[in-house]
């Protein structure tokens, strides 16, 4: 057990080192993710401006939170249905996690932005993982070539994972909390007992959800370092690896989850409240941007740590990464090379 913990700890440290060694990739992911949300933010800003106009309510809203206006705007404006008081400060991530646990559907008006962010993640993560596997510079051509190569593979993997997530978030969640929970607490009058049953059901729901998440991430890593074309094969390989190395896999995941919990706690404490003021607006943008950057760094560090753990579990640590993508020559240049090769062969006869 001690050796497994040391190996997992070393993998986590190496994962963070690889992410820190390519800061430009992390910055590109952050810029792409933030940029993908700008259209939705612009639509919301225009809707707020149209709704307020030059009314006296505008000054009240600018100076702080006006819940009466907020309720009116959320019910009247379609782009504002996701614009609720739960987005203020640290309540935003807490509300997101609470909604996930309770099986709430995401607001329809932000689905487009969410899908765009996920597609950008699928595209850029292939190039980032390829860079972490090689541990050397490949240039812009190599990076975006790897992004293009692995995008469609990760897209197929995402569709397979989506089926599993849909079952866990949909029917399985409904059975636990709409069927099992009422039956288990039908004769319970003590609130603490009902809470313990609900906590147990949350655990039973989170275990398969996290397990699928871990397997899919290890499948991504195996697809990159082994240049796998079949995502079913990558999933099977990931399942085998997780089954054979449960302790180090759990430690790598747990250590990065602990870092994520610390970052979340810091954001909850530092995030400004809903009071107005230019400096508070700047603080919201700065702290929110840093929180997003930290979350993406943690996600990449977990993948890089999983990659390190896989490499060290194979025959040798420096596992062969896929070859650098090479752009083909033009047809004219290829014809010249072929003619030269034919002339060389004829002269040697």
Where is each model-derived feature located?
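Juxtamembrane transition segments at transmembrane-helix termini in multipass membrane proteins
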Residues: 2-90, 124, 181, 192-231, ...
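Hydrophobic transmembrane alpha-helix segments characteristic of membrane transport
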Residues: 119-149
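Individual transmembrane alpha-helix segments
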Residues: 85-120
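Short membrane-interface loop/juxtamembrane segments of multi-pass integral membrane proteins
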Residues: 146-150, 190-191, 237-245
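Hydrophobic alpha-helical transmembrane segments of multi-pass integral membrane proteins
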Residues: 27, 108-124, 128, 159-172
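Loop-to-transmembrane boundary segments
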Residues: 151-160, 242-255
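Non-cytosolic segments of integral membrane proteins
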Residues: 163, 167-188
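Cytosolic-side membrane-entry/anchor segment at the start of a transmembrane helix
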Residues: 5, 14-24, 142-171
């Amino acid at each position: 057990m001690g050796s497994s913990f040391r190996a997992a700890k070393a993998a986590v440290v190496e994962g963070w080192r690889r992410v820190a060694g390519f800061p430009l990739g992390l910055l590109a992911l952050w810029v792409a993710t933030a940029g993908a949300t700008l259209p939705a933010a612009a639509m919301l800003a225009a809707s707020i401006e149209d709704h307020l106009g030059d009314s006296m309510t505008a000054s009240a809203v600018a100076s702080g939170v006006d819940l009466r206006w907020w309720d009116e705007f959320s019910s009247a404006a379609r782009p504002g249905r996701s614009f609720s008081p739960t987005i203020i400060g640290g309540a935003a991530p807490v509300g997101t996690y609470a909604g996930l646990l309770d099986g709430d559907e995401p607001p329809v008006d932000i689905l487009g932005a969410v899908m765009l962010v996920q597609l950008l993640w699928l595209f850029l993560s292939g190039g980032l993982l390829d860079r972490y596997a090689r541990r050397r510079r490949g240039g812009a051509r190599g990076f975006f070539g790897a992004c293009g190569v692995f995008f469609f593979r990760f897209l197929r993997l995402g569709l397979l994972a989506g089926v599993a997530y849909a079952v866990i978030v949909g029917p399985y969640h409904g059975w636990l909390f709409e069927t099992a929970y009422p039956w288990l607490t039908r004769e319970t009058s003590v609130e603490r007992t009902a809470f313990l049953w609900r906590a147990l059901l949350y655990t039973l729901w989170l275990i398969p959800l996290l397990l699928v998440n871990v397997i899919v991430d290890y499948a991504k890593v195996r697809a990159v370092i082994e240049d796998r074309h079949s995502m079913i094969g990558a999933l099977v390989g990931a399942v085998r690896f997780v089954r054979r190395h449960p302790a180090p896999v759990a430690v790598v995941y747990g250590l990065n989850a602990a870092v994520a919990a610390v970052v979340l706690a810091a954001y909850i404490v530092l995030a400004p409240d809903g009071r107005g003021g230019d400096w508070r607006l700047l603080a919201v943008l700065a702290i929110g941007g840093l929180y997003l950057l930290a979350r993406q760094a943690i996600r990449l560090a977990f993948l890089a740590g999983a990659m390190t753990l896989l490499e060290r579990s194979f025959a040798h640590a420096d596992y062969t990464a896929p070859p650098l993508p090479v752009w083909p020559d033009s047809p004219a240049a290829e014809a010249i090379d072929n003619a030269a090769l034919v002339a060389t062969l004829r002269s040697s006869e």
